[in-house]
Regions:
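Class I SAM-dependent methyltransferase Rossmann-like catalytic core
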Residues: 22-41
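Conserved class I S-adenosyl-L-methionine
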Residues: 55-64
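Class I SAM-dependent methyltransferase SAM/SAH-binding core
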Residues: 65-111
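A short glycine-rich, Lys/Arg-flanked "PGG" loop and its adjoining helix->strand segment in the class I
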Residues: 136-151
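Conserved catalytic/acceptor-binding region of the Class I
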Residues: 149-211
């Protein structure tokens, strides 16, 4: 079964929920958007190139549509395991990676996987959606899964600058939560690094990119001309979907100076370090 037919045969998560009630990332997926990361495909690919995928045992938290899973497989890992809490998304990713990997339906805080089973753990646009307590639990689980010397690679939404006024940060978080129907809790780049360091990880690389998820240029760069045209067509024929996406776009535009996509690769120290 091809990747395309696999995707088509599996429903999107929240596909039965009204468009005004569904989480924003799944609304964008309903519109036809496949790359749902704040810094775009280029930032993800740069992050993966620094994670050391070749010959590695890789675990991905919250693979969602499975786009990054495909890119990980291109890197030649020894194994791939997705950990996805949503059963529909887990089934979708399982079909996409069939014969080359697997996807388990589990919580990233408690994966059920063996300690020290991974050389690389990847997670994108999922820590942002959690409270600081849950962020810490997920990062700790990633650290548990990693072998000494293993890498944890994350791509998340960051507040900017590091000394952002707290009132601005609060307004941004509230506006973002209203727009995407998820209680998003982005952190500054400095705070993201501190989340990783608190679990004993050592930050090796930090990369950033504009948070331009719905800008025309980014859409074409991430989805291609054909993909951008597909999204435009879907929005043109569904007014509720169009209204919801435009609300998100206005919010992203309003706060664009205070948001970034950030990718960080951190290493679990070896026992003799």
């Amino acid at each position: 079964m091809s990747d395309e037919s696999s995707e088509a045969s599996t429903p999107l998560p929240f596909s039965q929920r009204p468009v005004d009630k569904a989480p924003g990332h799944w609304v964008l997926a309903r519109a036809g958007k496949r790359v749902l990361r704040p810094g775009g495909a280029a930032l993800t690919r740069s992050m993966l190139s620094r994670a050391g995928l070749a010959g590695a045992d890789v675990v991905e938290f919250a693979p969602g549509l499975g786009v990054t899973a495909g890119w990980i497989l291109e890197g030649g890992p020894a194994s791939y395991t997705g950990v996805e809490q949503d059963p529909d998304a887990a089934a979708r990713v399982g079909r996409i990676v069939r014969g080359r990997g697997r996807c388990v339906n589990a919580d990233a805080r408690r994966t059920g996987l063996d300690s020290g089973c991974a050389d690389v753990v990847v997670g994108e646009a999922m820590l942002t959606m959690q409270s600081d307590r849950v962020k810490a639990e997920i990062v700790s689980e990633a650290a548990r899964l990693l072998r000494p010397g293993g890498r944890y690679a994350i791509h998340e939404l960051a507040l900017a600058p590091d000394d952002i006024d707290e009132a601005v940060a609060t307004d941004l978080r509230k506006a973002l939560a209203r727009a995407i129907n998820v209680n998003a809790r982005p952190s500054t780049v400095k705070a993201w690094k501190e989340h990783l360091e608190a679990a004993g990880l050592v930050v090796q690389h930090v990369g950033t990119a504009p948070m331009a998820l719905l800008s025309p240029g980014r859409v074409v760069a991430d989805e291609g001309v054909g993909g951008a045209a597909r999204i435009a067509w879907n929005l043109a024929r569904d007014k509720d979907l169009r209204a919801r996406v435009l609300t998100m776009r206005r919010t992203f535009k309003k706060y664009e100076k205070n948001m970034r996509g950030v990718a960080i690769v951190a290493r679990k120290p070896k026992e003799d370090e």
